[in-house]
From Swiss-Prot:
Ranges of Low complexity composition bias in the record: 27-55, 66-86
Composition-biased stretches (Pro residues): 56-65
Protein name as catalogued: BTB/POZ domain-containing protein 2
Protein's cellular compartments: Cytoplasm
Quaternary organization: Interacts with topoisomerase 1 and with TRIM5 isoform Delta.
GO CC annotations on file: cytosol; P-body
Compositionally biased intervals (Gly residues): 16-26
InterPro entries on file: BACK, BTB/POZ_dom, PHR, PHR_sf, SKP1/BTB/POZ_sf
Domain of life, source organism: Eukaryota
UniProtKB keywords: Cytoplasm
Length: 525
């Protein structure tokens, strides 16, 4: 500190006017400061050294043209302003506390301010870096990381700290919050601010960042935010992103950010049973991602390299959910699948019994809420035979639902595999609304066994539909004492879904309202 500074302002950095002798009334001269107290030899020595080191008085500059006129003008202005104006002006330069009546205002004033600062941060890299002033006490009070940095066992004594991995705007947002509780984030800075808040353990600011992201979550940024949520370990935000992707899958996978996600995020999405999109469109999106990943890894974009970068993600594409036409026109010709896989899938599409394939054939259901089911029979009996004729029953409901599958009876002869084709037909137009050619395994019990559609089938209120199941396999159990009307009541809302069953005209393999197959309808409301 310069010898002319005030002893009561020792913590102030050079050049900041905060006390007498700095821009105000003249303080003691250098020679006066060097005068020791009588009888104090140590002080005398120190004062002598200070006096020797102090520069001599600076000679006044020679008067230039107009100097006298300028001085006279200044005197006239001071007289016009009144005798106390100059003193008030000088006081305002250092007595900033007087205009800040609350602690919050005083600390907010110190934000990004050289006044009283005792540490500087060199934030960022290269030309974009900034030198930001701060106050150790304020930072230590607001952050355990800063507390350890300044006061812990390995505390730094440096007054300049480099932070090359932090963005200046994000660090300023962090300081703004620590000094004033004010949240200053926007779309361009929220992710870097979240990173900085986590780095310095400021959970309240983390929560503000996550809340901002939730409010601004859309289909076109869901994948980008999902990647960041997984990176920063924000499970609640990640869950919201996945729900948004489920509901808006088609829009999300066409957004620019989709091809920028990492492999683990891609796998997390492909594992979901709740994506609302046809599998062939999902495959096409994954192919686009593989091209971008090849470029990131500086690999030539070839079918072999696409397969390489996809890794385990390829096994999560549910090729059996495609139609044979979709598979033949796309995946079969892509070169990503090996010949053995292509042949196996073509056999799966065309022959019965269907050979097992390496790929998942479980349908994706894009519906939210709890799965429901009703059973129309009150009792189970033995021996129901099959000769290639469909078991059919007509039904209607009182409200809109989505049917995702049927529960069917299995063998009376122990564990057995069945081949089955299930359909829902619009009765009046004879239009097939949904079907699946698949199979199921049973354990020989009288339980029902789930057989699911590839996609949910929308069923409208008070419209007649026909449920069909064509089984190939040994004699099975069957239901008796059938109910014409069955009501499902939601345990949470009390809402009622009422099914009415009727005889379906034609050959039904014996199934009717009273007895037969297709005991169970599985649906979402």
């Amino acid at each position: 500190m310069a010898a002319g500074g005030s002893g009561g302002r020792a913590s102030c950095p050079p050049g900041v006017g905060v006390g007498p002798g700095t821009g105000g009334s003249p303080g003691p001269s250098a020679n006066a400061a060097a005068t020791p107290a009588p009888g104090n030899a140590a002080a005398a020595a120190a004062a002598a050294a200070a006096a020797a080191a102090a520069p001599g008085p600076t000679p006044p500059a020679p008067p230039g043209p107009g100097t006298d006129a300028q001085a006279a003008g200044a005197e006239r202005a001071e007289e016009a302003a009144g005798p106390g104006a100059a003193a008030l002006q000088r006081e305002a330069a250092y007595n900033w506390q007087a205009s800040k009546p609350t602690v919050q205002e005083r600390f907010a004033f110190l934000f990004n301010n050289e006044v009283l600062c005792d540490v500087h941060f060199l934030v960022g890299k290269g030309l974009s870096s900034q030198r930001i002033p701060a106050h150790r006490f304020v930072l230590a009070v607001g952050s355990a990381v800063f507390d350890a940095m300044f006061n812990g066992g390995m505390a730094t004594t440096s007054t300049e700290i480099e932070l090359p991995d932090v963005e200046p705007a994000a660090f300023l947002a962090l300081l703004k919050f620590l000094y004033s509780d004010e949240v200053q984030i926007g779309p361009e800075t929220v992710m870097t601010t979240l990173y900085t808040a986590k780095k310095y353990a400021v959970p309240a600011l983390e929560a503000h960042c996550v809340e901002f992201l939730k409010k601004n979550l859309r289909a076109d940024n869901a994948f980008m935010l999902l990647t960041q949520a997984r990176l920063f370990d924000e499970p609640q935000l990640a869950s919201l992103c996945l729900e948004n992707i489920d509901k808006n899958t088609a829009d999300a996978i066409t957004a620019e950010g989709f091809t920028d996600i990492d492999l683990d995020t891609l796998v997390a999405v492909l594992e979901r049973d709740t994506l609302g999109i046809r599998e062939v469109r999902l495959f096409n999106a994954v192919v686009r991602w593989s091209e971008a990943e090849c470029q990131r890894q500086q690999l030539q974009v070839t079918p072999e390299n696409r397969r390489k970068v996809l890794g385990k993600a390829l096994g999560l594409i549910r090729f059996p959910l495609m139609t044979i036409e979709e598979f033949a026109a796309g995946p079969a010709q892509s070169g990503i699948l090996v010949d053995r896989e292509v042949v196996s899938l073509f056999l799966h599409f065309t022959v019965n019994p269907k050979p097992r394939v390496e790929f998942i054939d479980r349908p994706r259901c894009c519906l939210r809420g709890k799965e429901c089911s009703i059973n129309r029979f009150q009792q189970v009996e033995s021996r129901w035979g099959y000769s290639g004729t469909s078991d059919r029953i007509r039904f209607s409901v009182n409200k809109r639902i989505f049917v995702v599958g049927f529960g069917l009876y299995g063998s009376i002869h122990g564990p057995t595999d069945y081949q089955v084709n299930i359909q829902i037909i619009h009765t009046d137009s004879n239009t097939v609304l949904g079907q699946n050619d698949t199979g199921f395994s049973c354990d020989g019990s009288a339980s029902t066994f789930r057989v699911m559609f590839k996609e949910p089938v929308e069923v409208l209120p008070n419209v007649n539909y026909t449920a069909c199941a064509t089984l190939k396999g040994p004699d099975s159990h069957y239901g008796t004492k059938g109910l014409r009307k069955v009501t499902h009541e939601s345990p949470t809302t009390g809402a009622k879904t009422c099914f009415t069953f009727c005889y379906a005209a034609g050959n039904n393999n014996g199934t009717s309202v009273e007895d037969g197959q297709i005991p169970e309808v599985i649906f979402y409301t």
